[in-house]
Amino acid sequence: MIYRYLRPWLFKLEPETAHALTLNCLKWFYCYWLINRRLQRFPQKPTVVFGIEFPNPVGLAAGLDKNGEYMDELLGLGFGFIEVGAVTPKPQPGNSKPRIFRLPQARALINRMGFNNLGVDYLVEQLKRRKVKGIVGVNIGKNLTTPLEKAHEDYQNCFEKLYSYVDYVTINISSPNTPELRQLQSERYLADLLTRLKEDQRRLEDQYHKRVPLFLKIAPDLTPEEIQTIATLALQHRIEGIVATNTSCSRQGTEKLPNANEAGGLSGKPLFPMTLQVVKQLHSFLGDEIPIVAVGGIFSGENAQTLINAGARLVQLYTGLIYEGPELVKNIVEFLTLSRQTREGIN
């Protein structure tokens, strides 16, 4: 409710400034227990996926908390799970500013952040300090200076360092803002990457006596043939989940809007049809063998339910949260809970 009045003021600020201010305000509210009090009244819809019990199926997508500095506060908003990152082995500044652009008429964003983060070692320290229990995953990527032929080393480095502190790890091979990264979605690179990471997973499971699922995050701009190739490799290597989708290079539906020509990945409402199509195609190839996490253009409970009906097991929010505020989480969970009760004939 408060966010409705704050948003016009926040949108007058440069997007990264507004982002930092919002997160710092969230930390202040958390210190005064307002979030904890809100969470006590929050509806729950427990969902078991990948052998993990999620309090509800609505998660936070990677990108909002790149360095894991606000995990307790974000879990306090009522998310069933949060994903931090993307993180790389070494710190890197990302692309030059400005690198986030609003398209309010389309309820969309364009970003070209470029995996800016403080490095995996810093994130591990943040994970050690967190106090709130909850499901936390980490999105991992490669450093800008790492050639594709050695990209697997960056993913393996991050996976090993994070393994004992997280509930799952997402392999990000689909950001449009790191040159050549999306080539890792091709069979040539992906088969080798998955082979190496699954070998590491087996070794680390023996070492830590826990299994950390591996998810794969893919782009919305893939052809059906490319999606089928990825699905086949995911099945062959027994990847535990697929996150669909990342931001898009397309500008469909936004072409004439201010900032639409800025380079970067498009997120928000225009992405929803693409996300839905990819989820449907993935589910047609995977069935129920590999769960799908849907992200992209979710602004309502109806959006979330549509993606679940199409085959997704969980959903994630990002741009919808920026436009609608924290109440969106509660609204979606309530809608999904009522939808299930209606299907089960519960009055």
Curated annotation (Swiss-Prot):
Alphabetized SUPFAM superfamilies for the sequence: FMN-linked oxidoreductases
E.C. number: 1.3.5.2
InterPro entries: Aldolase_TIM (IPR013785), DHO_dehydrogenase (IPR050074), Dihydroorotate_DH_1_2 (IPR012135), Dihydroorotate_DH_2 (IPR005719), Dihydroorotate_DH_cat (IPR005720), Dihydroorotate_DH_CS (IPR001295)
GO BP field: 'de novo' pyrimidine nucleobase biosynthetic process; 'de novo' UMP biosynthetic process; pyrimidine ribonucleotide biosynthetic process
Binding site residues for substrate: 66, 111-115, 172, 177, 246-247
Signal peptide annotation: none
Active site: 175 (nucleophile)
Coiled coil: none
Pathway in which the depicted protein is active: Pyrimidine metabolism; UMP biosynthesis via de novo pathway; orotate from (S)-dihydroorotate (quinone route): step 1/1
Catalytic activity as recorded in UniProt: (S)-dihydroorotate + a quinone = orotate + a quinol
GO cellular component annotations of the record: cytoplasm; plasma membrane
PROSITE patterns with a match to the protein in the record: DHODEHASE_1, DHODEHASE_2
Cofactor or coenzyme needed: FMN
GO molecular function: dihydroorotate dehydrogenase (quinone) activity; dihydroorotate dehydrogenase activity
HAMAP family: DHO_dh_type2
Function: Catalyzes the conversion of dihydroorotate to orotate with quinone as electron acceptor.
Protein name, per record: Dihydroorotate dehydrogenase (quinone)
Source organism of this protein record: Coxiella burnetii (strain RSA 493 / Nine Mile phase I)
Lineage: Bacteria, Pseudomonadati, Pseudomonadota, Gammaproteobacteria, Legionellales
Gene from which this protein is expressed: pyrD
